[in-house]
């Protein structure tokens, strides 16, 4: 921007100087042509009037008005008629002083262009700012216009940057389903309770392993590794199957339970738990009961399976 402004100022100054030089040259040329067409008789003015004019010029004080007088006399012809003029004054010895005054006036006239040029230069310098300001305004307009056209592009870029942030909204985590528990019981058939030695042996043969919380668990792996599919606790208080000597442990029954959701297929886990409970009941001579300690019926088994299906559908 600064370089362009400097170039425009230099070009404007050169153009103005060229116009001034051409104007001075044209005015000088027109003056010569204008006076050259006049007859010689018109240039012979009254000698007395000429002397009085020249004396007034030689003795007049140098004021600012002299510049006006000099500018008017500057257009007088300075061609071959000056020789005739000078010869007339030089021929008359009485007018020798007047001839000298004539030379002094001519010297002043020759110095006129410098004063005129200086004054014109001052006027030109004063004019330059106003003339140079026009191209500067054009440059500013040229710079503003592209920015106005670029504004929509910038807005579009901002919209494109903001759009992905609006579209990409994090999905809200689904709430965890409410846990449900399915319970089966194996109870002794009479008044005689289960003895720990026989009970624990039957449980171990059906893949149950004593572990955490002092109860038995059925893992995915029969070696006791992996996720727990279901567990077995004491049906009586305090609920644990903790024992020091299995022969001294006894209980009226045990409870099988599994949770929903669970690892793997819930329906398969329920079927495995049901078979294990039935096998232990057969080994111990007991009965399989539901969660309310009623004898298991086909309708109650269907209700258990329906509960599992509805839970899976609600949390699919």
Swiss-Prot record:
Region annotated Disordered, chain positions: 36-65
SUPFAM superfamilies: Cell-division protein ZipA, C-terminal domain
Principal cellular location given in the protein's record: membrane
Annotated TM spans: 6-26
GO CC annotation: cell division site; plasma membrane
Segments on the Cytoplasmic face: 27-316
Subunit field text: Interacts with FtsZ via their C-terminal domains.
Family matches, as NCBIfam families: septum_zipA
UniProt name for this protein: Cell division protein ZipA
Gene name, Swiss-Prot/TrEMBL: zipA
């Amino acid at each position: 921007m600064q370089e362009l402004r400097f170039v425009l100022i230099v070009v404007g100054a050169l153009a103005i100087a060229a116009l001034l030089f051409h104007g001075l040259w044209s005015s000088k040329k027109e003056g010569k042509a204008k006076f050259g067409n006049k007859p010689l008789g018109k240039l012979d003015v009254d000698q007395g009037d000429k002397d009085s004019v020249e004396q007034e010029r030689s003795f007049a004080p140098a004021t600012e008005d002299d510049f006006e007088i000099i500018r008017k006399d500057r257009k007088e012809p300075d061609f071959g008629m000056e020789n005739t003029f000078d010869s007339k004054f030089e021929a008359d010895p009485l007018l020798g002083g007047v001839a000298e005054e004539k030379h002094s006036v001519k010297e002043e006239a020759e110095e006129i262009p410098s004063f005129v040029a200086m004054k014109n230069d001052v006027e030109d310098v004063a004019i330059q700012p106003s003339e140079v300001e026009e191209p500067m305004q054009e440059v500013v307009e040229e710079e503003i216009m592209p920015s106005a056209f670029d504004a929509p592009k910038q807005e579009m870029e901002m919209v494109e940057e903001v759009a992905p942030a609006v579209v990409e909204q994090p999905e809200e985590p689904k709430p965890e389903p409410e846990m449900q528990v399915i319970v089966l019981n194996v109870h002794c058939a009479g008044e005689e309770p289960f003895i720990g030695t026989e009970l624990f042996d039957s449980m171990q043969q059906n893949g149950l392993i004593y572990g955490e919380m002092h109860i038995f668990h059925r893992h995915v792996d029969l070696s006791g590794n992996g996720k727990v599919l279901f567990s077995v606790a004491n049906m009586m208080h305090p609920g644990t199957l903790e024992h020091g000597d299995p022969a001294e442990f006894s209980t009226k029954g045990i409870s099988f339970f599994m949770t929903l959701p669970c690892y793997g297929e819930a329906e398969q886990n329920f079927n495995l738990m049901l078979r294990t409970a039935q096998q232990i009941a057969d080994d111990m001579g007991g009965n399989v009961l539901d969660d309310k300690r009623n004898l298991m019926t086909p309708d109650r088994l269907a209700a258990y399976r329906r509960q599992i299906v509805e839970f899976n559908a609600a949390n699919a």
